[in-house]
Amino acid sequence: MLEKVYFELEDKVELVGLLHRPENTTDEVVISIHGMQSNCFKKREDILAKVINNAGIAYFAFDNRGANLMCYTKKTDGTKTLNGGSVYEDVLESYYDIKGAIEKMLELGYTKIHLQGHSLGCTKIVYAYNRLKKENYKNLENIQSIILLSLVDLVDLQKYDLGIDKYNKMLELAIEKEARGEEMELMPFDSFDHPISVKSYLRYYRDNQEIDFAKFNDNNYDFKEINNISIPLFLRWGENDLVVQKLDELIELLKNKINNPKLDIGYIKNTDHGYTNKEEVLGEEIKKFLKTV
């Protein structure tokens, strides 16, 4: 059964998502956090929901405030601001989105919660979970596991795509535009994968101390934010994913760096960052993992 669910966040923003219910009543749910330029209507979401519903677990996919390319952030008092979508979002605000989704699912009777992120959604989950843990969030124990699909090293990938000289040039340009009060203006079209505002660009590549924790090319990094996750942890990539290094090498590195005794890590062959044509394979691997939690 599919149900549309609206929910209000701590900062009064209203979001909406799709709750896929299994045939029998359950107290267990996967909350899915999408990545850049995405939404809860993806084919992948429908396939994962079907597979996970078959395991007797509900699946809640919602549009976070970074949904699609550009959108208004609407509040329950009727006001709206053009500061949403991948163009304008501040990834740190995902804390409110994720916390709000957790509390809505608890309100609906789901006491066993699994947080699942894709791409930037992984970044959002790791950041939000660490913040909730730091704040001694009263419902932290209801979070049973974390599922990270296609976690990306945001900074290193950008340097790889642009080259270090152009990377530095674009960062300097963003800082100059900020100094002129042009935070909401767009960066040059060749600075990023899609249109992006100055303020969002600076969040990813300058003001990123709280989200730059997937440092795959830094052999000395201790991955403390990921190691702060003590509950079961599932990580997957597609064989042709958005990573600079070879996946076999990356996975071996992370096996040595991540100290989680219930770590399930690997990649899926013959697919990409979005798991095209392998969504059901991914779903079955997630389902198998959830049975061990």
Segments from the language model and where they lie:
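Short, surface-exposed "cap/lid" segments of acyl-processing enzymes
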Residues: 23-76
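Conserved alpha/beta-hydrolase "acid-adjacent" motif
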Residues: 242-249
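Short glycine-rich catalytic loops that host catalytic nucleophiles or stabilize transition states
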Residues: 264-272
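Short beta-strand/loop motif that positions the catalytic acidic residue
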Residues: 229, 235-237
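Catalytic histidine-centered segment of alpha/beta-hydrolase-like enzymes
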Residues: 271-281
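Primarily recognizes the serine-hydrolase "nucleophile elbow" in alpha/beta-hydrolase
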Residues: 103-175, 206
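N-terminal cap/lid segment of alpha/beta-hydrolase-fold proteins
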Residues: 1-24
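Alpha/beta-hydrolase active-site loop
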Residues: 82-107
